[in-house]
A protein has these predicted regions:
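C-terminal structural segment of proteins
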Residues: 1-171, 177-178
C-alpha cells in the first residue's frame, strides 16, 4: 500500500472541503476501501483518506414521526440488533444481518456499502497476478462478467442485462425486476 495522509473530518462541511481539494477518498467503515487501496484498484491513488467516523450523528439509528432515520455511518450490526428496527422493520434487520461475516458487519456501514467500489472479481483481479484482465471497467474492451462465470455477481451497476436479476437470492427476498 502506498503512503497517504489520513484526515478525520469533524463535520460534513469539513469532509466536503477536503474532497474539493482533490486526490481524496472518503472512508466510512473502511472494510472495502482498505482492499481497494492495497490492490491499487483506483485509477488515481489518493493522497488523502478522509474518515467520516468522528462526525456527530452520522451513525444515528432513530425512529422519527416520518419513519426510520439511518445515518450513513450506521453500522450494519447495530441495525441488525436494534430493537426498534427488529420490531418495526424486520426485513431491514434481516437484510443487515445477512451481509458478510460478523466481523465485517461490526465495522461496515450503510454509506460504505452503498458507495463501495465494484465487487466484480474480473474488475478486482490484481494486475500483479497473472497479468491484467482486459476488463471494460478498467478501460478494456470486454465485460467478462457478462460472458464468463457470473452467477454470484451483483445485479446493480450492470452495463447490460442478460436475464431477470433475482428474487429469492436477494436480502429480505426482495424481487428486483430487470431494468
Amino acid at each position: 500500500m502506498k503512503h497517504f495522509a489520513y484526515e478525520s473530518a469533524q463535520s460534513v462541511e469539513q469532509a466536503s472541503e477536503l474532497l474539493r481539494k482533490g486526490d481524496a477518498v472518503l472512508s466510512a467503515g473502511g472494510t472495502d476501501l482498505t482492499g481497494v487501496l492495497k490492490e491499487k484498484l483506483l485509477p488515481n491513488y489518493p493522497r488523502t483518506v478522509v474518515s467520516l467516523k468522528e462526525i456527530p450523528g452520522m451513525n444515528r439509528i432513530a425512529e422519527e414521526a416520518d419513519g426510520l432515520h439511518l445515518g450513513a455511518m450506521a453500522i450494519l450490526a447495530d441495525i441488525a440488533s436494534s430493537s426498534v428496527v427488529r420490531s418495526k422493520w424486520p426485513a431491514l434487520a434481516n437484510a443487515a444481518y445477512s451481509v458478510a461475516t460478523p466481523n465485517l458487519r461490526n465495522t461496515a456501514t450503510v454509506g460504505g456499502n452503498i458507495c463501495q467500489d465494484v465487487r466484480c472479481w474480473y474488475y478486482r483481479y490484481p494486475d500483479s497476478i497473472g497479468g491484467r484482465v482486459n476488463c471494460a471497467r478498467k478501460d478494456g474492451h470486454l465485460c467478462y462478467a457478462m460472458m464468463g462465470e457470473n452467477r454470484y455477481h451483483s445485479i446493480f451497476g450492470a452495463m447490460k442485462v442478460c436475464q431477470t436479476p433475482c428474487s429469492h437470492g436477494c436480502p429480505a427476498n426482495t424481487d428486483i425486476p430487470a431494468y
